[in-house]
Regions:
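Short beta-strand/loop segments at the ligand-binding rim of alpha/beta enzyme cores
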Residues: 62-72, 113-123, 169-182
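Glycine-enriched alpha-helix->loop->beta-strand junction motifs that scaffold or abut catalytic
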Residues: 15-17, 88-94, 114-120, 137-145, ...
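Active-site mouth loops of central-metabolism enzymes
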Residues: 1-4, 68-80, 119-127
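A C-terminal functional module that forms or caps the active site or interfaces directly
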Residues: 160-200, 204-207
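Generic structural signal for hydrophobic
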Residues: 11, 59, 88, 113, ...
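Catalytic cores of alpha/beta
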Residues: 1-11, 127-137, 179, 183-199
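Active-site-adjacent beta->alpha loops and helix N-cap segments on the catalytic face
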Residues: 26-35, 44-57, 77-83, 98-115, ...
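Glycine-rich phosphate-binding active-site loops on the catalytic face of alpha/beta enzymes
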Residues: 18-28, 93-97, 102-105, 144-154, ...
Length: 225
């Protein structure tokens, strides 16, 4: 948590518009091998939800960029949905990406997010387009378009399919669309940004956090975009 805190406090020097902060979970279904391993290692060090809230409390008012939680629904449910959302608001979180949020829970979670003025960021893949209108109904902030079929760090879907997905989402919603999963470097990010509003890089940033720290880490991250 100490390294994460330092990273958050250095965020202003980065070119990032927003940061996803993952809460460690024992069964991270959407995460590839590398992020899952980082999650297990962090959890093994005793970093749990309360520890992350405490760290964010210490950073409050010192981070000028939005931070959203990437969190699995079981964590939210175990903590108490409203309690988790209220606490997130208190520590300065801007919204949530919940990869395994059951559709039947979406309305309640979206309602509580709205109550605390936080975003519930919808995830839509090339295979879930037929349910896009339903998913978008409860979404806010931006749309997370999944650029790969499978887990984070996977191979990207074809450019043609991705473009069609993003164009379809833009017709259905006024929310900006960012593409993640399968975006690994500056070339990928530049390509994605020709038709989407943003690019999301996860796995490669986790790799960098294992090698660098402080300002050097920020410098290396900036090279990815």
């Amino acid at each position: 948590a100490k390294a994460t805190k330092e990273f958050l406090l250095n965020l202003d020097g980065s070119c990032l518009d927003l940061l996803e902060l993952g809460i460690p979970y024992s069964d991270p279904l959407a995460d590839g091998k590398l992020i899952a391993q980082a999650s297990f290692e962090t959890a093994a060090k005793g970093v749990n939800t309360d520890a992350i809230f405490a760290m964010l409390e210490e950073c409050k008012g010192k981070i000028n960029k939005p931070v959203v939680f990437l969190v699995y629904f079981n964590i939210v449910f175990a903590y108490g949905v409203e309690r988790f959302i209220a606490r997130s608001k208190e520590v300065g979180i801007a919204g949530f990406i919940i990869p395994d949020l059951p559709f039947e829970e979406s309305e309640e979670v979206a309602g509580l997010c709205a109550k605390f003025d936080l975003d519930l960021i919808p995830l839509i893949s090339v295979t879930s387009q037929n349910r896009a209108d339903k998913i978008l109904k409860f979404g806010s902030g931006f749309v997370y378009a999944l650029g790969a079929i499978g887990v984070s760090g996977s191979q990207r879907a074809s450019e043609e399919r991705l473009k069609a997905l993003v164009e379809g989402l833009k017709k259905r919603s006024d929310l900006p669309v960012a593409v993640g999963f399968g975006v690994k470097n500056k070339n990928d990010a530049d390509e994605v940004k020709t038709y989407a509003d943003g690019a999301i890089i996860g796995t490669e940033i986790v790799k960098l956090t294992a090698k660098f720290e402080g300002e050097e880490l920020i410098k290396q991250i900036n090279k990815l975009f």
